Amino acid sequence: VEEMEGLYGLVQNGAKIQVAEQYHLHPLHAARIAFVQGGKLGRVTQAQLSVCHGYHGMSVLRRLLGIGFEDATICARTFVTPIVKGPGRSGPPVEEEVVETKQEIAWLDFGDRLGVFDFVGDQYFSYFRGQRVCVRGERGEIIDDRARYLTDFKTVVETPFIRHDAGALGNLEGNHHKGYTVGEDWMYRNPLAPGELTDDEIAVGDCLLKMAEYADGGPDFYSLAEACQDRYLDIKMKEAEESGVEVRTTRQVWAG
């Protein structure tokens, strides 16, 4: 935390700094965030995220909840279980091997909103450990790639997040991701189409585009203050895991 305070001092002295964070720019995450911000769920009160680790997870969780720098009470635990080892950065497995894996589960109580963080490191590469997202509001919710919401007190609409990719079923536009729609509305359009890129590569590329815009006088897209806050929440979550007791965050210098 002291190192982040020192780094933020550069901003206080006039430095212009953004941080290269891409997870909230992943196509489906960006589509979910846009849908939440569109208001159809009403006031969002809870988000459950099992997608990515540490500060990456915090960055997505905060956006789904509409949280800025509010303080939280955090309780967290870990749970170790066996799992058949899957692929990794060096490639697929060559034989069956059972290894131990650690699950992190944390409850972040922001008072009027609740964040639930749940992650196992194997989720990045495992053949069977998937991702899960739930966002709950007073008028509806998102569960993974489906939204359900009220248009009035007795009428519910259920609609999927539809992924649009070029190049399948006879389509000759090329092989690339186009975006996501919910109903008739585009929630996300790929800014790097028609590049043939993975979702993570699209997110990193979008981050670079936004960094260039910022350097040219454009708006923040992931400020040092946000990055410090997400890492701070991650640090306090680890503290709660290790101590086994609730931890309370306090307002930091980068929160203004």
Name these PLM-found stretches:
Residues G6, Q12, K16, D185-G256:
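C-terminal helix-rich "cap/oligomerization" subdomain common to oxidoreductases
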Residues H26-P27, Y55, F125-S126, F221, ...:
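Loop/helix-junction capping segments adjacent to catalytic residues or to phosphate/diphosphate-binding pockets
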Residues D112-G205, S223, T250-W254:
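NAD(P)-dinucleotide binding in Rossmann-like oxidoreductases
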Residues V1-V60:
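A contiguous active-site-proximal alpha/beta segment in oxidoreductase catalytic domains
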Residues L64-G68, E141-I142, M237-S243:
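Phosphate/oxyanion-binding loops and surfaces in catalytic or ligand/nucleic-acid-binding neighborhoods
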Residues H24, L28, H53, V98-E100, ...:
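Soluble or luminal CAZymes and related metallo-dependent hydrolases
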Residues R43-G130, C134, A225, W254-A255:
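Rossmann-like dinucleotide-binding domain that binds NAD(P)(H)
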